[in-house]
């Protein structure tokens, strides 16, 4: 961000209202507002179109990082989204941040009152809402900070026959230029050394995983089948002998049942839990052999006397209805209790003990004084005479005779073909074209 000098004759200044909302993506939501004002004499909304504002924060080593940007509307307002990392809990800014205006072309606009005028500072705090603002009013020059261009592009030429009153000369057609081909160049072959072999380690053989060993499941001991006991055969009894009617019994007075008195159950203080001791292994005994008893022989039927001849007498009392004789109860045979055989115990190996290294005992450092050695005396120099080794003279170099170089004469090249004479060009038009309406005015340049 550079500070440019204010140009002469500039008309600065537009009213800007900066409103920056912080996104509450974290658990601690905050709202940051930056409010700034600017002075201006121009109230047209066209001066704001295309302008853009960015919030640049200064990081280490003097570099600026853009934290947010937004466009300005017709009223001079804009909204920005900035991260909440630059604002602390007490509202102070962790970094130095500045507001920067950009023109419609994207170039930054110069600051008129220096960089400190666009600095964002802390103003106030209301609850979770932090209000920030600018030190001074923002100013910009419409001549330097240009907005969008609203005038339409001019139509050129304005009417037919305005640009070229005379036809253009025909294009020049030059004959083709043929260049004599040069003989090919032969160069001696270059001996390239063989590439250095790259030795790679042999690939590691993949060892297949070990084959799992599956042990057969332990066989469960099935208890012997439970014997089925059949009930004894029913014996048909003779018809009952009618008895004399009994006098009616007095009716029983049924009293209502007494009202039960419910007392709260007494609190039972549970003793401490008894440690569970594993019982010793049970010795399995074979089941007892059932003893079957032979059924008794049925008794012979008793002789039934014929019924006596009834003597009809006038009834004195109404006879009682005969009592119903209930059949004998059916015996309920309960199956013998099942013998539950506990599953076989699986003896697990004892756990592998984990040996931890003994804790290190830190002893205080022991100061050992340095050992000072006595300096040795310098050695006595021994002077020896230099040994002279005579060198043999080198023989003269053997002359190498090379054959003379044979010069091959070259044929002279044929003369170059002469180009045909250039055609005569038409005379150039005058410098200023005479026009009946505008007179001798210079021609207008074409519009880009």
UniProtKB/Swiss-Prot annotation:
Location comes to:
Secreted, Cell wall
**Could you name the Gene Ontology cellular component terms for this entry?**
extracellular region
Repeat: is it a keyword of this entry? yes
Q: Where are the sequence repeats?
A: 152-156, 157-161, 165-169, 170-174, 175-179, 183-187, 188-193, 194-198, 201-205, 208-212, 216-220, 222-226, 227-231, 232-236, 238-242, 245-249, 250-254, 256-259, 260-264, 265-270, 271-278, 279-284, 286-294, 295-299, 300-304, 306-311, 314-320, 321-327, 328-334, 335-341, 342-348, 349-356, 357-363, 364-368, 369-374, 378-384, 385-389, 390-394, 395-402, 403-407, 409-413, 414-419, 420-424, 425-429, 430-434, 442-446
Q: Does the keyword Phosphoprotein apply?
A: no
Give positions of region: 46 X 5 AA approximate repeats: 152-446
> What keywords are assigned to this protein?
Cell wall, Repeat, Secreted, Signal
Region annotation Disordered: where it falls in the sequence: 240-345
Q: Provide the free-text tissue specificity comment from this protein's UniProt record.
A: Mostly expressed in aerial organs, particularly in expanding leaves, stems, flowers, and siliques. Also present in stipules.
Q: What residue spans carry the Pro residues bias annotation?
A: 240-290, 306-319, 327-345
Q: From the UniProt annotation, give the residues forming the signal peptide.
A: 1-29
Pfam hit, one: Pollen_Ole_e_1
User: Principal place where this protein is found?
Assistant: secreted
Family membership: Belongs to the plant proline-rich protein superfamily.
What's the protein called, per UniProt?
Proline-rich protein 4
Q: What species is this protein from?
A: Arabidopsis thaliana (Mouse-ear cress)
Q: Which gene encodes it?
A: PRP4
